[in-house]
């Protein structure tokens, strides 16, 4: 889903979110735990990666665009933004399919930074925000809480996780907490459709 669409969906519903998914770094096979928790802030994240329209694909996904925004859920306001283009190193030339799908050009990724450098910049951005707004990813600590919001688990559970493993990059601990907004919107659709079904039945 488009990054701006995810963001606007969150703002329009002014969510009281729960069901944080916690993924441990060491084993992808470990179960995902869920807890009910309300948040004051969300960081909306939506990677773009290398991709192909062939099977098998010509390579593995590498992040090429790393955008994020911090949302205040009480107001719906965007408080801060982060954006970097990332230079792929395993398959440095973007496919025509990828460029058409993402709108990202070869020149943009050629001028991008390595993923490791991007993670360092992003971690610094996160640290400043946590200090500025006195927020924490640790839901066991009293105070204001924040987590990531993604469209499906692909961004953090698969794409970033696997690329960090392949490139032997240390993935920051805070990336192990996120909310799958797709599940939330599906729940909203079901809640809206159910009374419609009843109403249609009585016509």
Where are these regions (language model features)?
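Short glycine-biased active-site loop of nucleotidyltransferases that positions the nucleotide triphosphate
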Residues: 56-58
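N-terminal accessory regions of nucleic-acid-interacting proteins
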Residues: 1-47, 52-53
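Core catalytic alpha/beta fold that binds nucleotide/phospho-ligands
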Residues: 115-117, 128
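Short glycine/proline- and acidic residue-enriched helix-loop micro-motifs
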Residues: 104-109
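Short, conserved clusters of charged catalytic residues that mark active-site
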Residues: 27, 117, 143
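Metal-dependent phosphoesterase core characteristic of DEDDh/y 3'-5' exonuclease domains
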Residues: 33-40, 60-64, 70-102, 123-203
């Amino acid at each position: 889903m488009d990054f701006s669409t995810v963001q606007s969906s969150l703002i329009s519903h002014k969510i009281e979110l729960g069901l944080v998914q916690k993924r441990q770094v060491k084993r992808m096979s470990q179960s995902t735990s869920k807890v009910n928790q309300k948040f004051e802030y969300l960081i909306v994240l939506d990677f773009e990666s290398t991709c192909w329209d062939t099977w098998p694909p010509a390579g593995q996904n590498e992040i090429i665009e790393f955008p994020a925004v911090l949302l205040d859920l009480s107001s719906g306001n965007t408080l801060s933004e982060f954006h970097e283009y990332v230079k792929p190193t395993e398959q440095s030339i973007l496919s025509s399919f990828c460029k058409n799908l993402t709108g990202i050009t070869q020149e943009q990724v050629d001028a991008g930074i390595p993923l490791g450098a991007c993670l360092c910049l992003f971690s610094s951005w996160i640290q400043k925000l946590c200090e500025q707004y006195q927020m924490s990813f640790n839901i066991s600590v009293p105070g204001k809480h924040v987590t990531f919001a993604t469209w499906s688990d692909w961004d953090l559970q698969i794409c970033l996780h696997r690329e960090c493993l392949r490139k032997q990059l240390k993935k920051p601990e805070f990336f192990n907490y996120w909310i799958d907004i797709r599940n939330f919107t599906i729940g909203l659709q079901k809640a809206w459709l159910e009374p419609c079904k009843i109403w249609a039945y009585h016509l």
